[in-house]
Design a protein with these regions (language model features):
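Bacterial N-terminal signal peptides that target proteins for export
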Residues: 1-8
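Cysteine-centered motifs
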Residues: 12-14
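C-terminal motif of bacterial Sec signal peptides marking the signal peptidase cleavage site
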Residues: 17-18
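Extended, histidine- and acidic-residue-enriched regions that form the cofactor-binding/catalytic faces
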Residues: 24-136, 140-156, 162-349
Length: 349
């Protein structure tokens, strides 16, 4: 299995790809139908099977999108990553359509599944706001969906998500590699390659907040300044109480594993009160260029194996290794419980 190091991992970050003006409503409110001579955006669930069969296998891209449900503090909906992954997909489609008007873009409905939650770092494994599945389950879903597309001859599959948990990312990278190698297609985990370059742009944050701003606020990450800003830009679901939230300072990634021992943690880090839609717009515009560049490399057939990949780009950390071992232990216990129950049920048949 891909080497996993859980350092910055639990800073669940959302990669949204966009370059649209602030006054324009999010594209993710609905896929756009184009003329029927190519260059269409097609919702898979709305097509008949003859219509699917007419799609060009080479000049089309299937977008396989995952949006997990996870606590994001008292101010951002638990569907934060879901909404942002949806935005990634639609806004990247806009960018790609401009560059490749001959391609059909096929939109698979967002799958609301993900592994882990930032609350796990606080040892709150059953947090009321997080609905997660096991790593092996997520990997299997991604593989099966990818195979279902690739086995029909469609050559391009872009996997989009918005969650920073390491095993979540590894599941998608392994699934993409399996489908690509087994079926001779290009299934690319776009988001984890973007994360390999970094999350939110320090340059953008410094521009808006001033250099050294995080000396007071700490690293921005899960439901903090950056992520709250991104949500403010994308939709109107952020609770106005974000303006009154006190900073929860984590000085560096090593401090992530101490949050469960500190009083007052409400499911976020950094300082949500400093967020703004304007910051979110600029962070997103930075991310769109990186995501689009990776997508272009994939479409041109470039070897992506030399690109930095999350979480393989993280440094080693004993606390992370211990946490990862505990996570696999919990999953093994759950799987053993399920296996025992199924065996008992089958004995009675």
């Amino acid at each position: 299995m891909t080497s996993v190091r859980l350092t910055l991992a639990l800073v669940c970050v959302c990669t949204i790809v966009a370059c649209m003006p602030a006054e324009e409503p999010p594209v993710s409110q609905g896929a756009e139908q184009a003329p029927m001579n190519g260059g269409r955006v097609l919702k898979l669930e709305e097509l008949t099977y003859p219509e699917i069969d007419e799609i060009d296998r080479d000049q089309s891209i299937f977008f396989l999108t995952f949006g997990n449900l996870e606590e994001h503090g008292p101010h951002i909906p638990v569907g934060s990553d879901y909404y942002q992954a949806n935005g990634v997909r639609d806004l990247l489609i806009k960018r790609l359509r401009a560059a490749h008007p001959e391609y059909d873009m096929v939109v698979v409905p967002v799958i609301p599944l993900g592994e882990g939650g930032f609350n796990d770092a606080a040892h709150q494994f059953d947090h009321v706001g997080t609905f997660a599945i096991r790593y092996s389950t997520l990997q299997a879903v991604a593989i099966d969906m990818g195979v279902s597309i690739a086995s029909k001859g469609f050559q391009n599959i872009f996997l989009i998500h918005s969650h920073g948990a390491p095993l979540h990312n590894v599941a998608f990278t392994e699934a993409s590699a399996f489908v690509s190698e087994t079926y001779g297609v290009r299934m690319v985990n776009i988001t984890s390659l973007v994360f390999g370059e970094g999350f939110y742009s320090d340059a953008v944050l410094d521009k808006h907040l001033g250099e050294g701003w995080n000396q007071e606020s700490g690293i921005t990450g899960h439901a903090g300044t950056g992520e709250t800003s991104a949500n403010l830009f994308l939709h109107d679901l952020v609770n106005p109480n974000y303006r009154e939230l006190e900073p929860f300072v984590v000085e560096d990634s090593f401090g992530i594993f101490d949050i469960g021992d500190r009083n007052g943690w409400q499911g976020y880090i950094s300082d949500p009160s400093r967020a703004s839609a304007l910051i979110g717009r600029d962070l997103i515009n930075d991310l769109v260029e990186r995501s689009f560049r990776i997508a272009e490399l994939a479409l041109s057939g470039e070897d992506l194996s030399s690109l930095p990949l999350y979480p393989d780009n993280l440094p080693p950390m004993p606390e992370a290794d211990a946490y990862l071992a505990a996570t696999f232990g919990r999953y093994a216990s759950r799987e053993a419980e399920i296996t025992a129950w199924l065996e008992k049920q089958r004995e009675g048949r």
